[in-house]
Regions:
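Active-site helical microenvironments for divalent-metal-assisted chemistry
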Residues: 2-188
Length: 188
């Protein structure tokens, strides 16, 4: 059974499965999944998904922007067997091109939870390098849009100073690198 049914109900799942318009399918799915979720500043999480989607220029990009946090963030800690998977997205007919990009940008937890801040940063930087090395333009554009929104000065201003410093340290250099790679890929 598709795990999405646990979160959005069987009727909604069937409606989404049968939708032909890919963008509306993704939009309805995230509207249902993230309706109550808040970001680190206490704002509706959906706003982040919409902003990332709005930065993308193709239909596939806009859909990926909406869906980019579904597998990473829709979890039930006490019941990991209910975590949403990429197969759940395939089941609702999300194209493989989009799923491949989502797989590349979806963070995997570090091997241990007891890493130092520098080890966490190094692990994150390795994930960015993996995205770049994939040469998957959709994934590179998606990660660039996601990081640009997370590193937006307006959003950062709503966070405590410690979080601002962490995000600056985490996003500043990798974002520059991604933008450069994206620009090279587009102009070649």
């Amino acid at each position: 059974m598709n795990r999405l049914a646990f979160y959005i109900g069987i009727e909604n799942l069937e409606e989404i499965k049968n939708m032909d318009n890919l963008y509306l399918k993704a939009r309805l799915l995230v509207d249902l999944l993230f309706a109550e979720k808040k970001d680190k500043a206490g704002k509706p999480y959906l706003y982040h998904l919409y902003r990332v989607s709005d930065q993308m220029t193709t239909l596939e990009g806009k859909v990926a922007g909406l869906l980019h946090d579904v597998v990473e963030d829709i979890k039930t800690p006490d019941f990991p067997e209910l975590d949403v998977t990429f197969d759940d997205l395939r089941d609702i007919k999300i194209p493989e091109e989009i799923i491949e990009a989502l797989q590349l940008v979806t963070k995997t937890p570090p091997p241990t939870r007891f890493l130092s801040k520098q080890e966490k940063l190094n692990y994150y930087y390795q994930e960015i390098d993996t995205i770049i090395e994939s040469n998957n333009l959709l994934a590179i554009e998606l990660k660039t849009a996601d990081m640009s929104d997370n590193y937006n000065p307006e959003r950062l201003s709503e966070l405590p100073e410690e979080k601002k410093e962490w995000f600056t340290q985490k996003y500043s250099e990798p974002l520059k690198k991604l933008k450069l790679v994206k620009e090279r890929m587009i102009t070649c």
